[in-house]
A protein has these predicted regions:
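Intrinsically disordered, low-complexity regulatory regions
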Residues: 1-92
Length: 92
């Protein structure tokens, strides 16, 4: 198991960059959007916050790692689609 985990972490590092860099970028993005919402007196539903957090996570991977990895972009679209569908009455 340790070998499998090491291989997985190495592969992810090659794709997304060092985890500490990703964490730094992602936490800045999350703090920024939450600050801007609060500054404007806005709130969101839990699914919207979660989707935004996951989108920021994916953007962090793009910024810190490989911007040409299509799956990251598809994931962003997927999280946005889940919220848009729910707003249109389709809960997934």
């Amino acid at each position: 198991m340790t070998q499998d985990l090491t291989e997985t972490l190495t592969e992810r590092g090659m794709r997304y960059g060092a985890f500490v860099g990703h964490a730094e970028v992602t936490q800045h993005l999350k703090a920024y959007y939450r600050h801007e919402l609060a500054k404007r007196g806005k709130n969101m539903d839990p699914d919207q916050f979660e989707a935004m957090d996951m989108i920021m996570h994916k953007i962090g991977r793009i910024v810190n790692g490989d911007p040409d990895y299509a799956d990251s972009w598809v994931d962003i679209a997927g999280y946005a689609k889940l919220v848009a569908d729910r707003l249109d009455g389709v809960v997934r």
